[in-house]
Amino acid sequence: MSGSFWKFGQDYSIESPVSKILNSAFIKINKDQDDDVPTGTCEENIADDEDNSSHDYAASEDNVVNENEEKEEENTLPTTESEYENYRPNLDVLDDLLDDDELYTELMCSNFKLLIFLKYPEVLSKLIEYVTNEKILDEETDSAKKPEIIEGVNDHPILIERDRKDKKEDAEEGGDSEETTNDSDHDSGDERSVDSEETSITLPPESEEQVETRRARIAAEILSADVWPISAAIMQNKDLLGRLWSILDHPAPLPIPASTYFMKINERLLDMDITGMLEFILSRDSLVARFLTHVDNPSLMDFLLKVISTDKPDSPTGVIKILKSQELIPKLLDHLNPEYGISTQSAAGDFIKAFVTLSTNSSNELASGIGPNELTRQLVSEEMIEKLIKIMLKGGTSLSNGVGIIIELIRKNNSDYDFIQLVYTTLESHPPTDRDPIHLIHLVKLFAKHMPDFADMLDKTKLPLMEMPFGNIEPLGFERFKICELIAELLHCSNMTLLNEPNGEMIAQERDIERAKELETSTEKENITFIVDNKSSYYDKDCVEKDITENLGALQINNQGSEEDELNDTGVSSVKLDVKSDAKVVEGLENDASGVELYDETLSDTESVRECLREKPLVGDRLKIALEDTKILISILDMFTEFPWNNFLHNVIFDIAQQIFNGPLKTGYNRFLLKDYLVDAYLTKKIVDADKACQDYEKKTGLRYGYMGHLTLVAEEISKFKEYIDEMKLTFCNTAVSDRLEEPFWKEYSETILADTREKYNTVLGDFGNDQESDDDVIRNSDSEDIIGDTEGNENYGNGENDELLSNGHDSGNMDLYYNFNNNENEENEEDYAEYSDVDNKNYYNNVETNDDDYDSDDGKSKSAESEFTDKISEHRDGNSLYNEDNDENGSDKWTSGTSLFPPDHFPSRSQPSDPKLQDQNIFHHQFDFEGVGDDDDYMDPNDDGQSYARPGNPLYTTPKTPPRPKTILFNSLSALDNNGEDEEVALGTSVDDRMDNEISSDEEDSEDEDEENDMGNEEGYSLYRSRSKEAF
């Protein structure tokens, strides 16, 4: 036992250290004060008596007293939970329990006394005190600080010794042995000293801070353990939860260990009792402010996201209403300002993006999503978007985080993927709710308004040159890249169907007004059981009223007295009428402008159409108009060649170009962006010049510019666009676009450079084209010529009976049977294989041949697959040719010569047809005749499932009767491979294997006896004899 790694004793009756500690962990309430003295006091009294007696007597007396007390305490402790009501916990043993390594293991093993002890409120309070200790909360990342080391500690190693029980057992065993000599004692002492040296390690003593940190970690593990009694005991004492949540009141930054403990414990309680936990959380004052104090703490913000995720559409919990009433979204946007640190800005932006992802509008995006809600609706409101844009225009990290939020909003709330399209709904059929999909009308309109500001930022941003191995270049910079990315995403958003519907904005505004009224009514009537302090409103009505006032301009709001929370019905009605009338005007203008080209092949891109669209633009067209006015798309396109090594920028520019060339041509303002790209920006000329510049640069440096891949993609988009308008026979009223596409230099580039590049892109990777034919191709061509040559002298060719046969005889399946022969031989040489013998032999497995490559070729006993193949060809070249003229005279025998592709011991024969007349039919005629295909082979397949029986007239299960096999192994048709076969016959004819001759002769004798039996069976029409395995063929 001394050298074993097992630290537990073999005696299962021995108590664990935790159980021993728990024996003194309970104090009976009705006991006298003397009996209530803890174990530590008794030990002190015993220690005082040691001064008046000898050390040995005192030590033995102490052991006896402790053992008696432990036995007595063990016998007196109750065995049921109800009986522990008369006991109180002994908190003095809690530190000993936390210091024991087996505490958590005992807890997960449901130690009864341990669970009873930990359920006491006093014990739980002590554990929470460990977690919320000021030393833990004030812990700084000062890992460089070393604990104070007592002098002389490092001079003496600390020995990790065996358990005291093991030492005691070893001592008892040593006492029982009477024949032990002094030498043996000396040897055992040396062995123990060696063990001590091997297991010794020098460790500095733990400081007080380290001890408290370790105990806090164990306390957090206990409180967050998946043990229902402990979690239930915590939930029954709200004061304990209040002390735990006091961690949030600690000033930032909060140490990561403390926040991790907080998250683990609360997540466990939330999973166990979601109703009780949410009731407690929502009753906290200033919940949002307390969390945002630690916004850069990932553990706390992750827990807040989990709390939000409990408010689902089918089971609302009121969390979203509370967070909105406490202005979560505005306060988060405030943290994006440059006044805060970069880490705080990034943390706030990441939280908003995670919340948008959680509230995605796509039903199949996240199974645990909560869908659109009032928080995301507030985020895309006019006030919040205006606030976000102003923060983004400050540049730096604020711009980067803002662009990320906008991109996430657009991608997760695409109205084209709504289950029910908004334009096909009415207030009666689909009454608005707080879970309706959100629209991005305000977002697009406000970014169109501030587009000149972003264009100025894009043009004015300049960065110092950066030194690179190939020269000094100007870096693009994060701000310019983010603006380009923002423009591409806004262009995606402007193509949404809702934003290009004449009535889309009107319908959305109507639903917003109705939703505000309904939420106001429900707020007055609803009584949420979770909320204790509801002084603040659940819905920010002032924000909604401001949006409606600014957008519609006709809504009268009464902000006095009791009418503060009500909307003026008369104002709403007038607003609806005005919006409807405006929508009719817009629709009429659109029809007037584009009604001609709806069913016409001429695309109206005249100035009159442009002015009509600009006068009353739709939401999507408003953004495109802003892009055209600011010329920001052309500026971004010019950056393509200005930053030839930034592939991120090139990908964004290609995305923009792809949207423009694939956008609508007959409706909307996209056709004018297309004109700007091709005419004003002269995109075709830019592509040709960029390609020429790359060629010149390659000649000088041997390098190609990094934009060439995306340059080809943009050129392909133009090429596809030209093919589309040619195929659809579309023409532009303004011929400038067509003229650009018909210019000679562009045609030359498209037909030469672009075509060659397209061909290279479409080539299979690694397929460079083989100039020389392979050996297999030569064999295939020879066989094909052989068949064609034989058919010229075939009398039966062309009579209709054999035409189909010859056309199908040279199929890929039969030819591959031969072409893969060499490969099969090589595969068989790579591993051992077993040959099957005839049934007459008692042994199914004749012999096992090892790999020929394992032996030396000089022994003469083994040959390679290639030499055998050559010998077999040479021996039987003059045997029976596949297309012999003699065989042509007798059509029925032409395809039934007894040749075989494989040696007879490897593969079985196939069964004869049930009807002898079927033998002459072409369906059974194969290009290659196989040796041993007749019924004379009695091979039994051990893998046969017993279900493959011959069926009459079925070509898949029957084969024609074949005559006895001649002495040939391989195809007779291989004579066509070489016209000078006679010269090779003399050289190769004498190299036939003797073993093959013996096997063939024995097979011929067996075939004569079995042919008569098979013929008798075939005379009756069909038989149920089992067919041979077809897997070999």
From Swiss-Prot:
Biased composition annotated in UniProt, kind: Polar residues: 909-924
GO molecular function: protein phosphatase binding; protein phosphatase regulator activity
Feature: compositional bias, Basic and acidic residues: 158-170, 183-195, 858-879
Keywords: Cell cycle, Cytoplasm, Phosphoprotein
GO cellular component terms given for this protein: cytosol; nucleus
Residue positions where Phosphothreonine is found in the record: 990
Sequence similarity: Belongs to the SAPS family.
Subunit structure: Associates with the SIT4 protein phosphatase catalytic subunit in a cell-cycle-dependent manner.
Protein name: SIT4-associating protein SAP190
Source organism of this protein record: Saccharomyces cerevisiae (strain AWRI1631) (Baker's yeast)
Lineage, highest ranks first: Eukaryota, Fungi, Dikarya, Ascomycota, Saccharomycotina
